[in-house]
Amino acid sequence: MTILFLTMVISYFSCMKAAPMKEASVRGHGSLAYPGLRTHGTLESLTGPNAGSRGLTSLADTFEHVIEELLDEDQDIQPSEENKDADLYTSRVMLSSQVPLEPPLLFLLEEYKNYLDAANMSMRVRRHSDPARRGELSVCDSTSEWVTAAEKKTAVDMSGATVTVLEKVPVPKGQLKQYFYETKCNPKGYTKEGCRGIDKRHWNSQCRTTQSYVRALTMDNKKRVGWRFIRIDTSCVCTLTIKRGR
């Protein structure tokens, strides 16, 4: 498990080191930048001859530092008032020459953290905390998969404008495809008629797909290409309304 985790971390940061890192504005009027990368310092310090090695060393000193950097990443950009119910996620976008075989690294890091927490429990406590043993089920059935920009074609950005999602991103040695890890309600699941575990005598329930913002390379209606935050499907939640007349 530890060896697999180490391999994923090294591969992930190798991709970050190979990807272009230039200044980019949120609304897409800047230059090309790697999505989801948290930059430190000035632009000159990022584009110097040793910028990639410095960033790689500072982030990969220990497993704990890597987890802290990715799980506690802070976003200062806020959605507009119209889209204030949406969150910001940058880990659901990946640049790759082929369809990714695993969920985003941040998801795997969370699973690894849970694995470490479970390792510190006694066998009895571990069995008791296992959701499968307690009979726990999700309120709404969902499905997750990687989709390409060719499947999305268009999306809504943070200003509410419809933009074109570009299928390929230029990199120094060619082009990579943009992949988005989307989560939505499962139309073939057992909760398509309502949320699981809800008292239907008193409540109307519905499983609904919600969206969050991720950073992607897009083009607006004025043919301006840049990195913008767009909305994609990221979760399936239960919505409730009380039944009247009871």
Curated annotation (Swiss-Prot):
Residues 1-18 form the signal peptide. It comes from the Eukaryota. The gene is BDNF. Glycans are attached at residue 120. This is Neurotrophic factor BDNF precursor form. Gene3D superfamilies: Cystine-knot cytokines. The keyword Signal applies. It is found in: Secreted. Belongs to the NGF-beta family. One of its GO terms (biological process) is negative regulation of neuron apoptotic process. Residues 19-127 form a propeptide. Disulfide bonds join 140-207, 185-236, 195-238. GO terms for molecular function: growth factor activity; nerve growth factor receptor binding. One of its GO terms (cellular component) is dendrite. PANTHER family: BRAIN-DERIVED NEUROTROPHIC FACTOR (PTHR11589:SF3), NERVE GROWTH FACTOR NGF -RELATED (PTHR11589). Keywords: Cleavage on pair of basic residues, Disulfide bond, Glycoprotein, Growth factor, Secreted, Signal. Important signaling molecule that activates signaling cascades downstream of NTRK2. During development, promotes the survival and differentiation of selected neuronal populations of the peripheral and central nervous systems. Participates in axonal growth, pathfinding and in the modulation of dendritic growth and morphology. Major regulator of synaptic transmission and plasticity at adult synapses in many regions of the CNS.
